[in-house]
Amino acid sequence: DPTKPALVNPKNIIEAILNQGVTSMFASPALLNRVGEYGKKNRIKLPSLKRVISAGAPVSPSIIEQFSSMLCGDAEIHTPYGATEAVPIISIASNEILSETRKLSEQGYGICIGRPINDLEVCIIKVSDDPIDKWSEDLRVPDGEIGEISVKGDLVTRNYFGRPESDALAKIKDQDSFWHRMGDLGWKDSKGRIWFCGRKSHRVATENRTLFTIPCEAIFNNHPGVYRSALVGIGPLHRQKPVICIELKRHKIKYSKKTLKNELVGLAQQHELTQDIETVLFHPSFPVDIRHNSKIFREKLAVWAEKKLS
């Protein structure tokens, strides 16, 4: 069923690759996880594969490591970043992820998505939900500071069809050109790499500070019983209550949810990044997009969480 890549039979995918001598593969993170988990467990190798591309949602280093165990020679997994309005704009390969950026991702620095593609300009600008009429260098934030990822180049779409309100929110005029605001948050490191920290609309603004989804979720995802997590905010912006929603790994829970909840709250308190998160909710199966089964619908989870807590 192409609408459920997370439930694919890994044997069928592996058999097709081996029988047809497949050299290139594109897979969503959910499918990559499903096939990689089976392949690593059964020590399967895919010698014909020269490159694997995974996109549609952030690809965790653990999924990359898992699938890489099946690859041979100099074959790598590439995780390009982009959107319908501009794709691809940034990319990175598995060797750099596993050797350099993985540890930082698991410590809550975000997911490293790599460096800009040639002939594209990518910059990080101040976070704002308002339209920006004209470009100014004052919009840029210093390296290391989280802001909105913005891009300028020939492959970026100029406007939306019949949607001037969307144009105003996404496009910034810059003399004869323009910048496109991706709606994603991230920061740039000293090597020019971009680190993805989640959607701008998904950030959780409490009375004290702003929390970003991908960095915070990484802390909870380190727990062996957690399949994936999602940070949501309950209440009005700048007065939101942060709630971490947890989807557990199937068939691997050996203790009660009460015990697990206490462990997760304790884990949050160990990290400055997550110390404000005191509410944990368990969800049986996160709502995800039909194409990739990887993009978590945090808006739906926020509605669910609010009902659970009311």
What are these regions (language model features)?
Residues 131, 136-213:
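Conserved ATP-binding/catalytic segment of the ANL
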Residues 22-27, 36-108, 121:
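Gly/Ser/Thr-rich phosphate-binding loop
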Residues 134-136, 183-185, 222-249, 276-278:
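C-terminal boundary motif of the adenylate-forming
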